[in-house]
Amino acid sequence: VYWSSHSTGTHAGAAVEKDHAGSVSVAFGRPSAPENSSLSGGANGRSTTAGQKQTAWSDHFADGDTADLSFLIVGSTRTDNGSGVDQDLLTDWTTQVNQAILVAEARKDCMVIASPRRSSVVNVSNESTQSTNVLADFNTATSTSFGVFDSTWVYQYDRFNDKYCWIPANGHTAGIMARSDLQRDAWVSPAGFSRGQYLGITKIAFNPKQASRDDLYRARINPVTTFPGQGTILF
């Protein structure tokens, strides 16, 4: 669109440099061959440290007047070890879960939803060992009426990265709690075959048998179990 009289010094094909009233202007050249460049010198981002996550719970969610929420969902507790390498330590898991519980107990208007560590259940072949690991994890968590603990990680499709991955089950657990609240009432249990079904997952890392489910239940941990023909259920 022609809307003004521009200097011909900037026309395509003009001399590379042209003097206009004592100044030098650089002309626009015609397109040339594609430019090939290689990005270098960058670095991958790091995971947050346990201390950073602990501080974030207090800084962003402690004030009930400014942070309106019902669930504090403790996601993956993997942290940076200070040199850019991820780690999955029980001490870091305990720090993060207990800090979230402190926030919830102080607010008294929300609940913490937590899953065990990834290394406790994922790629652990023995069901009995998985049960022992989960019990050991939650044995370090503060006993509270403001927390809900489940027993596993789930394997599902990540449509944003076009791949399958393991994630903590607590996001799904919070979802079925919200659904139960919406369809029934807040005090109605979201567990069982009618209200406790996990959707959109391929498999779970730890599928506890009856003996393990009994042990988990006594330790205030809600077993997540897959039943043939029934799906995956918060039991």
In which residue ranges do the predicted regions lie?
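A glycine- and small-residue-enriched flexible loop/hinge signal that marks low-structured segments
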Residues: V1-F235
